[in-house]
């Protein structure tokens, strides 16, 4: 830790001074701050350079003995973009619409897949910040501030500045007391065995606990929480309770409807439409942790309510068919949640395995420092936040254009973390690392 902090200080001081003198503009460079800004700048430039492309899709509504459903035309021979895009001049689309109106239609295939999702791991700080950003719209800084109040003043949650998502066996042994304290207010959300059945190795693993374990409620039932404190406490409680719930099970059905005669018949063009529908089989842990109300699938025309009983070979009537104007979308701007994830996984972009492995544990920054890094970019004018979205400013773009690749990529952090790992194993000296 001492080596890391001293080296960070030297890099920040020397590079910041050099670029400030070279440009007559006060600039700040940091081992974590600058690669994080580089990700924002790369995204900003991609958004500015983006030119939307207009295209057409064809949507049809079918009706048979089991009910109505909607589908989107696709070319099975084209893999790009699912084969759904047609030129905007409308010539090809008009020909397809005319053919489809003439029918007939029949279901060519029905495929169902079941997806089972286990309950999520407990919160470390970064995951809590991501979750609060998605559900509450909070910045990483605000989440940390409220979590600190819950920990220091209200004694309601455990230490929040943790990078672990597991519990030690000793802490897990206290969970029955925690659940007992939660029962009066939260008992309706308990699954069978909550607080009685010990959590398994997915949650309890001494080897995966660093200095501090995952964030969980304490056995102290909090009182007089303000609105913000209650909202964050609610997330922490629900995440713990979810651990005793079962998997979330959903069944996704994909139907291909062929129009234009019996599929495969010679001399006939067969147009195919894809329809998909998802049905929750078992809510499981999502009964405790529902997704944000704002989280919706993109309108790709394929996700639809499918009537039960659809089967291969069933004849369908074409009720309606039309082309729909669409356009490609620019890359999405970072939010606190997605930028925290990008920082956490930055090492995966490194080609050299040793450097990538060295960053697996922390990525860029640590859970305790990432919120501060984001706020530093904002206060120094390198980035700005509009609603939940981050964007790089002109000042930030200028800085990234000036600094060398080695400083704005995660490689510097990777090299340092590899050297510091050697120091922890007793394979080197701090003085040598500092001189290098």
Which role does the model predict for each range below?
Residues 87-232, 240, 244-252, 263-265, ...:
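Structured DNA-binding interfaces in DNA transaction proteins
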Residues 411-436:
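Non-catalytic DNA-recognition/assembly elements of restriction-modification systems
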Residues 12, 30, 284, 313, ...:
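Glycine-centered flexibility motif
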């Amino acid at each position: 830790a001492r080596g890391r902090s001293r080296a960070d200080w030297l890099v920040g001081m020397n590079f910041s001074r050099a670029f400030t003198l070279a440009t007559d503009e006060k600039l700040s460079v940091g081992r974590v701050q600058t690669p994080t800004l580089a990700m924002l700048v790369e995204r900003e430039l991609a958004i500015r350079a983006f030119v939307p492309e207009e295209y057409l899709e064809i949507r049809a509504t079918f009706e048979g003995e089991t009910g109505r459903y909607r589908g989107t035309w696709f070319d099975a021979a084209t893999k790009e973009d699912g084969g759904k895009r047609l030129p905007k001049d409308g010539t090809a689309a008009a020909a397809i619409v005319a053919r489809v109106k003439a029918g007939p239609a029949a279901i060519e295939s029905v495929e169902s897949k079941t997806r089972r999702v286990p309950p999520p791991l407990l919160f470390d700080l970064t995951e809590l910040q991501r979750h609060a950003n998605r559900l509450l719209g909070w910045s990483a800084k605000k989440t940390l501030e409220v979590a600190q109040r819950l920990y220091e003043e209200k004694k309601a949650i455990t230490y929040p500045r943790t990078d672990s998502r597991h519990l030690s066996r000793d802490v897990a042994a206290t969970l029955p007391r925690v659940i007992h304290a939660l029962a009066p207010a939260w008992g309706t959300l308990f699954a069978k065995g909550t607080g009685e059945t010990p959590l398994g190795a997915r949650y309890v693993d001494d080897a995966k606990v660093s200095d501090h374990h995952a964030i969980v409620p304490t056995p102290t039932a909090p009182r007089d929480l303000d609105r913000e404190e209650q909202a964050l406490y609610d997330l922490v409680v629900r995440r713990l309770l979810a651990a005793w719930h079962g998997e979330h099970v959903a069944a996704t059905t994909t139907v291909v409807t062929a129009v234009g005669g019996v599929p495969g018949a010679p001399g006939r063009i067969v147009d195919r439409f894809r329809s998909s529908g998802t049905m929750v089989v078992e809510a499981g842990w999502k009964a405790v942790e529902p997704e944000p109300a704002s989280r919706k699938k993109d309108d790709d025309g394929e996700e639809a309510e499918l009537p039960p009983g659809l089967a291969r070979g069933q004849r369908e009537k074409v009720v309606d068919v039309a082309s729909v104007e669409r356009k490609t979308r620019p890359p999405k701007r970072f939010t606190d949640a997605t930028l925290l994830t990008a920082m956490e996984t930055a090492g995966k972009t490194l080609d050299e395995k040793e450097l990538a492995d060295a960053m697996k544990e922390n990525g860029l920054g640590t859970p305790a420092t990432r919120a501060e890094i984001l706020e530093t970019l904002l206060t120094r004018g390198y980035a700005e936040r509009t609603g939940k979205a981050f964007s790089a400013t002109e000042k930030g773009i200028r800085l990234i254009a000036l600094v060398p690749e080695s400083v704005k990529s995660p490689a510097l952090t990777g090299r340092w973390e590899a050297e510091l790992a050697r120091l922890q194993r007793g394979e080197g000296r701090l003085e040598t690392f500092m001189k290098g």
